[in-house]
Amino acid sequence: DINGGGATLPQKLYQTSGVLT
């Protein structure tokens, strides 16, 4: 997980996959 939280659900899923910074 990159950001660790605070995003909307789909954004959180992408972050967990390491797609978003």
Curated annotation (Swiss-Prot):
The keyword Secreted applies. It is an enzyme of class 3 (hydrolase). Its EC number is 3.1.1.74. Induction: By contact with cutin. It is found in: Secreted. Inhibited by diisopropyl fluorophosphate (DFP). On the 2D-gel the determined MW is: 40.2 kDa. Catalyzes the hydrolysis of complex carboxylic polyesters found in the cell wall of plants. Degrades cutin, a macromolecule that forms the structure of the plant cuticle. Allows pathogenic fungi to penetrate through the cuticular barrier into the host plant during the initial stage of fungal infection. This is Cutinase 2. It comes from Colletotrichum gloeosporioides (Anthracnose fungus).
